[in-house]
UniProtKB/Swiss-Prot annotation:
Binding-site list for Mg(2+) 2: D108, D110, D123, E126
Family membership noted in the UniProt record: Belongs to the Ntdp family.
Cofactor entry: Mg(2+)
Binding site for Mg(2+) 1: N90, D106, D110
Protein name: Nucleoside triphosphate/diphosphate phosphatase
Keywords: Hydrolase, Magnesium, Metal-binding
InterPro entries: DUF402 (IPR007295), FomD-like_sf (IPR035930), Ntdp-like (IPR050212), SA1684 (IPR016882)
Gene3D superfamilies (alphabetical): FomD-like
Entry EC no(s): 3.6.1.15, 3.6.1.6
Function as written in the Swiss-Prot or TrEMBL entry: Has nucleoside phosphatase activity towards nucleoside triphosphates and nucleoside diphosphates.
Keyword DNA damage: no
GO MF annotation terms: magnesium ion binding; nucleoside diphosphate phosphatase activity; ribonucleoside triphosphate phosphatase activity
Gene source species: Staphylococcus carnosus (strain TM300)
Length: 181
């Protein structure tokens, strides 16, 4: 049995995403924890090494704040670019944390949000393909579709990680923690 742990502020952790079949999908080598509770983990990273399932690696281009919630089937990456904040939202299982990493299952569907507030649902073809290949249960599909709706409401209502104050508060906290280290 895996013992769940709650990451502490200032701690550096790995983030591991998996596919439904249990195979590793992607690993972010280092994210600094800004807030860790039973329900929410908020972290920050910048120029972080990412390893893909096939072994390829790349480095993130900009500072980002990541948001995970234990009750919702999505996570949000807030990326700070010259022309504004972009959001990349992964439809995924709720997160779990253990001594190794923060972990979740990536379910292919993504929502990209632009600085002007417009957003698009991405990768529906990949989702349909993997749903058949990996035999996603029908109730997973229902949960994910419901969470797409919740995510769209959050975006439109500027709730949670889409709230302007969220960005200000957590970006500042990340900058201060980086200065200390």
């Amino acid at each position: 049995m895996v013992k769940e742990t709650i990451p502490k502020e200032g701690e550096n952790i790995k983030i591991q995403s998996y596919k439904h079949d249990g195979n590793i999908h992607r690993v972010w080598s280092e994210t600094t924890i800004l807030k860790g509770t039973d329900h929410v983990v908020i972290g920050g990273n910048d120029h972080t090494l990412v390893t893909e399932s096939d072994g390829r690696t790349w480095i993130t281009r900009e500072p980002a704040i990541v948001y995970f919630h234990s009750e919702y089937w999505f996570n949000v990456i807030c990326m700070f670019r010259e022309d504004g904040v972009y959001y990349y939202c992964n439809l995924s299982s709720p997160f779990v944390c253990d001594d190794e990493a923060l972990k979740y299952i990536d379910y292919d569907l993504d929502v990209k949000v632009y600085p002007n507030g417009k957003y698009h649902l991405l990768d529906e073809d990949e989702y349909q393909q993997h749903m058949q290949q990996m035999n996603y249960p029908k109730d997973i599909d229902v949960i994910l579709r419901r969470n797409v709706d919740i995510l769209q409401q959050w975006i439109e209502q500027k709730k949670g990680p889409f709230a302007p104050d969220f960005i200000k508060v957590w970006r500042e906290r990340y900058k201060k923690l980086r200065q200390k280290s």
